[in-house]
């Protein structure tokens, strides 16, 4: 009877010694030398062999905003003393994803979202890939659903083109 108790006591002492040695080992090593995984990316299309078609928006890097290209979201939330910029950004992301999913494969360029007082205007250029009746139905569906969701009038300003407009090749 004494032998099993002693062996259990011996195992417990061994575990305590191991734990103490691990604690001193962990406390002495406090620097990690791993490679950094957060890499910066350029927000532009890289110049290649000249076989990559790009649109006007993608051809110019972001520092040309307000010089050669415009803002894709126009509202007064970023002015001094105005609130709600974060909420508008989340709304813009939802609207862009909703329209991309509704008109799948038909977007020719980026969507421009304008807010004027209580009116939400969405400007888009689409490629003619579907029948006109279906296209008009999806426009009405989008306007109605977003109007009920945001509780304000939503208007889609739409232009259609035969194929994607290519600005230049990079």
Swiss-Prot record:
Superkingdom of the organism of origin: Eukaryota
Any matching Pfam family: MRP-S24
Gene Ontology terms: cellular component: mitochondrial small ribosomal subunit
Transit peptide: 1-30
Keywords from the UniProt entry: Mitochondrion, Ribonucleoprotein, Ribosomal protein, Transit peptide
Subcellular location, record wording: Mitochondrion
UniProt KW Ribosomal protein keyword: yes
Database matches in InterPro entries: Ribosomal_uS3m (IPR026146)
GO biological process: mitochondrial translation
Location, primary (coarse class): mitochondrion
GO molecular function, one term: structural constituent of ribosome
Subunit record text: Component of the mitochondrial ribosome small subunit (28S) which comprises a 12S rRNA and about 30 distinct proteins.
Family affiliation: Belongs to the universal ribosomal protein uS3 family.
Protein name: Small ribosomal subunit protein uS3mB
């Amino acid at each position: 009877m004494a032998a099993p108790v002693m062996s259990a006591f011996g195992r417990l002492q061994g575990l305590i010694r191991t734990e103490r040695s691990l604690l001193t080992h962990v406390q002495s090593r406090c620097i990690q030398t791993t490679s950094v995984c957060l890499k910066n990316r350029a927000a532009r299309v890289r110049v290649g062999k000249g076989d990559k078609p790009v649109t006007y928006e993608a051809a110019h890097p972001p520092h040309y905003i307000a010089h050669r290209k415009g803002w894709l979201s126009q509202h007064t939330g970023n002015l001094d003393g105005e609130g709600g910029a974060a909420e508008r950004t989340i709304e813009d992301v939802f609207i862009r994803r909703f329209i991309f999913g509704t008109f799948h494969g038909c977007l020719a360029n980026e969507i421009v979202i304008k807010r004027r007082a209580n009116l939400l205007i969405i400007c888009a250029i689409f490629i003619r890939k579907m029948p006109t009746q279906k296209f008009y139905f999806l426009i009405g569906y989008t306007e109605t659903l977003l109007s009920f969701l945001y509780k304000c009038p939503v208007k889609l300003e739409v232009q259609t083109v035969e194929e994607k407009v290519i600005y230049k090749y990079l």
